[in-house]
Swiss-Prot record:
Required for the formation of a threonylcarbamoyl group on adenosine at position 37 (t(6)A37) in tRNAs that read codons beginning with adenine. Is involved in the transfer of the threonylcarbamoyl moiety of threonylcarbamoyl-AMP (TC-AMP) to the N6 group of A37, together with TsaE and TsaB. TsaD likely plays a direct catalytic role in this reaction. Belongs to the KAE1 / TsaD family. The keyword rRNA processing does not apply. Keywords: Acyltransferase, Cytoplasm, Iron, Metal-binding, Transferase, tRNA processing. This is tRNA N6-adenosine threonylcarbamoyltransferase. Binds 1 Fe(2+) ion per subunit. It comes from Rippkaea orientalis (strain PCC 8801 / RF-1).
Length: 348
């Protein structure tokens, strides 16, 4: 029953949490949305500097919230991959320093494995095997979760990730950053059937289409051309709500079809969803309904565990620590490590 202090700094949230197995003792998240909003996206150098400014206050708050002392903590964890290198280094260096000072084992964690473990934070009874749909600003993947550290990627995006597509379409519609939440809100007042948009299919060299891979660049381009056409016809009245609803519904429909098809083909009877786009209300609606229709259990974590946080990192780290998996203090951060290579982070 390991208790872990975990740090997450892979992108633009500075987060610290203390987790006992699947129970959250404290969780602190300092968002940088306001900092990057002016630029329409995350500026890596600014993100790293902000992590340096914020990390100590987050550590102090997490310890205070937990009512625990260092004698109660069994290990220190940090996200080591993937992510922005400079941002990752802030969390990794901080965690390693704490591990040395307090003589605790260090546990490096894969960010996507953290999103998988967010499922357990809200439902501690959930266990592998299951299919995980990971959808965020940087990733769109269908992952067969076999056990702690052992994953098979069955589907991925070939270009833009789903969350990235939301941000880019929001920019086209002058809705600001981040795009996901504002499109979700606006779509509630629009007609999702107003415009027919392509779901995006990935062609195979031998012909046909990949059943589980995604592509969103064509959808983004279709929205751009539609906006250009509509602006020519009526420069004073762009149907932004209808465009947002049609785009969002298309993304949700595509992800739902691929997830259900993958689960059925592989005989998997449960799907967990993780990542920032898991907060999207239309995706939740469509996938839950499809799950009921096909007798597949579908789990979405609460909204607070969809976006980046350190509690999910701590949950994954605790599981690894319980199994005797620890990381070397010489372990380097890695901006592109695949989810299938998670066990490269550990010595055991």
């Amino acid at each position: 029953m390991a208790t872990v202090l975990a740090i997450e700094t892979s992108c633009d949230e500075t987060a610290v949490a203390i987790v006992n197995n699947r129970n959250v003792c404290s969780s602190v998240v300092a968002s940088q949305i306001a900092l990057h909003k002016t630029y329409g996206g995350v500026v890596p150098e600014m993100a790293s500097r902000e992590h340096l400014i914020t990390i100590n206050a987050c550590l102090e708050e997490a310890l205070a919230q937990s009512n625990l002392s260092w004698s109660d903590i069994d290990g220190v964890a940090a996200t080591m991959a993937p992510g922005l290198v400079g941002a990752l280094m802030v969390g990794a260096t901080t965690a390693k320093t704490l591990a040395i000072v307090h003589q605790k084992p260090f546990v490096g964690v894969h960010h996507l494995e953290g999103h998988i473990y967010a499922t357990y934070l809200s439902d501690p009874t959930w266990e592998p095997p299951f299919l995980c749909l990971l959808v965020s600003g940087g990733h769109t993947s269908l992952i067969w979760v076999k056990d702690c550290g052992f994953y098979e990627q069955l589907g991925a995006t070939r270009d833009d990730a789903a969350g990235e597509a939301f941000d880019k379409v929001a920019r086209l519609l002058n809705l600001g950053y981040p795009g996901g939440p504002v499109i979700d809100r606006l779509a509630k007042t629009g007609n999702p059937q107003a415009f027919a948009l392509p779901e995006g299919r990935v062609s195979l060299p031998e012909g046909g289409y990949h059943p589980y891979d995604s592509s969103f660049s064509g959808l983004k381009t279709a929205v751009l051309r539609l906006v250009q056409t509509l602006e020519k016809d009526d420069k004073n009245s762009l149907p932004v709500a209808d465009l947002a609803a049609s785009f969002q519904s298309t993304v949700a429909r595509s992800l739902t079809k691929k997830s259900i098809a993958c689960a059925l083909d592989y005989g998997i009877n449960s799907i967990a969803v993780g990542g920032g786009v898991a907060a999207n209300s239309e995706l939740r609606k469509q996938l839950q309904e499809a799950g009921i229709n096909h007798n597949i259990k579908v789990h979405f974590p609460p909204l607070k565990w969809c976006t980046d946080n350190a509690a999910m990192i701590g949950c994954a780290a605790a599981d690894h620590l319980n199994r005797g998996h620890t990381s070397s203090l010489s372990l380097n951060v890695n901006s592109r490590l695949s989810i299938t290579d998670v066990m490269q982070l550990y010595e055991f």
